[in-house]
Amino acid sequence: MTDRQNEVLAVLGELADAWNAGDAAAYASHFTEDADYVTFFGMNMPGHATIESAHRALFEGPLRGSKLVSGGGEPKVRFVRPDVAIVVSGGGSSLSGGEPVPGRESTLTYVLVEESGGWRVASFQNTRVSDPAAGVPMGGERRTLG
């Protein structure tokens, strides 16, 4: 890895640290003011303030005590311009600090921009890993509505 790739990956490490501490303000501080955050179920949370308030509610509610878990090998870091990086990595979460929950594995895509001497996330997408042929999330059971 180059120094610049390591700078970008350090931001992802800081995001994980903030998540694991349940600190919504620290988590959101790594996003640009106009960032887009697309959840695993396709909802877009536009803007820094929305990302912070949504994560505060999550960290105080259903994701209290959850921890991020890396997975899927080394993250891929690609610079599309010197000040724009795309990172694709794997990951998941454990609830209440336990073992990773089957069916929560994701492919994570980040677009980071360098501004004011540091890297910030301009766009993020969390895509759950699934088996489209079976309609079942990998490691999980078939889920239906109703």
Model-inferred region functions:
Residues 1-4, 134-136:
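A detector for short, charged/polar N-terminal pre-domain segments
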Residues 5-6, 11, 24-83, 89-90, ...:
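A solvent-exposed, acidic/Ser-Thr-rich amphipathic alpha-helical stretch
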Residues 15, 22-23:
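Short helix-adjacent coil turns
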Residues 93-97, 112:
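Beta-strand elements of well-folded, non-transmembrane domains
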Residues 105-136:
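Short beta-strand edge/turn micro-motifs at domain boundaries
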Residues 142-146:
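Extended, polar beta-sheet/loop recognition surfaces of beta-rich domains
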